[in-house]
Amino acid sequence: MKTLALLAVLLGGISSATAANALDCSAEKTKDYRVAAICRSPKLLQADHDLNEAYQKLFNGRPKEEQLVLVRMQREWLLSSREVGCSSTKEHPEQEEECLYNNIQGRIDFFHSAEGIGGSTQGKLIFKGYYLPKKKESDISIEVSVFEFAEPDSVGKIAFNKYAEALLADGKQRGHDDNQGDGSCTGSCEETTMMSQPFQSGKFISTPVDRWEATGGAHGIGGTSYDNRLLNKAEALTFADVFPEYYAAPIAKLCWDQVAPDGNGPSLATDGNYSFDGKEYPAIPSDEFMKAFKAPTGWSFDGKAITVNFGEEVLGTYQEGAESCTLPYDSVSQYSRLYPLPGSPEDLALQARILKRREATKSGTGN
């Protein structure tokens, strides 16, 4: 998967970005069964071609400073996001093909939306970044990559742009503070903050923000949070924007049943579940669980469900790992203040009607 010619171009620099071609299907490259599977799939080969074409069109139309950020963003997508959610085994080639195809098409849609075209876009995006390489061994490399709305014509877009600028400013400040040559860094030290591909529909946008810090030891720290916004509001999304408070308990129970079935799960997710002096204390969601569950910075959207990501050590020790639950729209829509839910069939139908009305107005045929 990671041997695409486009990847080689990106890693080699931006000067030859227009030369990106389809997947390398030479005998040497197809020793990797994943590459071989793609090379046998006309559907994926065409999708790869379309991806390169969409990337080149976006890249070629942007100034050099935006090109530099796009290169890094696309490099990270190819290395870490292309195969997200897809099977890595040979036993499920059809499912893997469909998953990879959907991921590639989603990336193409993002490139289109970055130009301000397409049914689910909120306007043209511009790309910004800050990169400070190590100058000496004791330094820390700093990299920040974000995007902003080119025309922030709503309070939500203005707030989103301010958030992106704050990420850049923080990276620059850390670059100043951390690179003082104090000898605290003795290995491969780096800090990365990167906006990943957003989900957007109607007046809503959900943007993953990936953070990673390596301090030279065996492990690094980091994770993904989500900037979720209604674009007609200046504030980031709150639980109350989506669900009334009095529905918090039944909705949380749907999630808790996945994270701690029968009360068995991460140590901090559950209260009760024990007997004392002959009295039973049944398992219930803990205060820690409820607090984390109700924080939309852990919510990701895909148009079909809300996934709640708790992160490591939120509900238990490091060894207990990260936990998450998935709430399909059809299980929570009855509770939601948002109607239609972003990306749902009802929302897509609404956006199609709005787009049709706009086009009719532009052509002079609308009412």
Tell me what each language-model feature is.
Residues A5-S15:
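Bacterial N-terminal signal peptides
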Residues V71-E83:
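Acidic helix/loop microenvironments that form the catalytic cleft of cell-wall polysaccharide enzymes
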Residues S15-A22:
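Sec/Tat signal peptide C-region and signal peptidase I cleavage site
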Residues T18, V69-L70, A292:
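Intrinsically disordered, low-complexity regions enriched in Ser/Pro/Gly/Gln/His and often acidic
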Residues D24, K31-H49, E53-N60, E66, ...:
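Compositionally biased intrinsically disordered regions enriched in Thr/Gly
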